[in-house]
Amino acid sequence: MIIPDINLLLYAYDSSSPFHKKAAAWWQASLSGTGPVGLAAVVIFGFVRIGTNPRVFQNPMTAAAAAGHVRSWLVQPVVQVLEAPPDHADHVLRLLVTLGAAGNLVTDAQIAALALDHGATVHTADADFMRFRGLRWFNPITGVASRRLPKSEGA
């Protein structure tokens, strides 16, 4: 299973991004492939939150357009919305404490915890995911993948 990060989904829909073509091709291949795609709620709503923000994009999506994209993903047979296990909040907090950081890593830690819980690989262009020990990740823009590090106590 793959779990996409918000940044790749935004690149796939932002034609002004230098990563647009690669991200769009990756996302289309992921949705039309046979491997499972897990969507985390934090990713779904992060896509809507950032994609509609005029402070982030010169031409942001409308709420209707962003919702339409999300709905088009959810009807794909390979897509499933991931359920967080009961200890998800504690797992995220342990990851953050282990890193000794929070701030901008809070969303990444939520995605990382779900990936670790589901044995999934995070697809991302965000190098911060390298900081989570034991996490498998892949950057479809560069083709670089993680070398799986042993899990730490926080994982």
Regions found by a protein language model. Give the residues of each.
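Short, well-structured N-terminal submotif of metal-dependent ribonuclease cores
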Residues: M1-I3, N7-L39, P54-G68, A145-G154
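Conserved glycosyltransferase catalytic-site signature
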Residues: I6, A41, L105-A109
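Structured helix-beta-strand junction loops
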Residues: G33-T34, Q76-P77, H118, F132
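Ligand-binding beta-strand-loop-alpha-helix segment within the catalytic cores
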Residues: W73
